[in-house]
Amino acid sequence: MTSGYWVLLALPATALAGVACERIASDYARRIDAGAAVDGATLCAALRAASTTVFLVCAAASLACVVVLILMRALGPLALARAGACMVLLLLALIDARCRVLPDALTQPLMWAGLLLSAAGLGPAPAAALAGAAAGYLFLRGVNAVFVFWRGHEGMGRGDMKLLAALGAWLGWAPLPEVLLAASLGGALVAVLRWGRQAWRATLPFGPFLAAAGGFGLVRGAVVQFPF
């Protein structure tokens, strides 16, 4: 199958999946703003509310494109799993951008899925995946502890730590410095463009940048060279 035909099917599936994720994230953020708990029940309620005709059409069209790709052997099991992981990352990024929360109902299943796929022989070696999950969480936990000691309050949420742990489970430990570098540079650039000289005082959610860097890592490999 030529790359042109692959793109013709993959891009519509990606766009339709993005529409579905945006709809779910909007409904979830609305419920959180209304006082709902940040838990799996609220997320499930948002999923049910999003199951309208538009959402079902988007999901059906995306599934049809994926099935065609599988039948034409243009999408293997690992690529299919990573596509699903990218959808979850997109949903997490949209939720964090709206209500500054990364729900455990998404980050923890994402991490366990990466570990289980690694154990099944898909993705990095099990030892690398386990080390990546541990390193991702512990590194950001350590950075946050230093920030608390220095400034007297936390600099990031536990959801960021769990998201990096999930990315470590999918990518292994080696690409994590690259993911963090790309996410940090992206966040710094957005802060400077938005607030200028006051950027160092601003706060913005880190989840969207982590999700974007992790998504590029899943789709295209390393973001930058590991030694750098």
Predicted segments with their positions:
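A membrane-topology feature that recognizes alpha-helical transmembrane segments
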Residues: 1-228
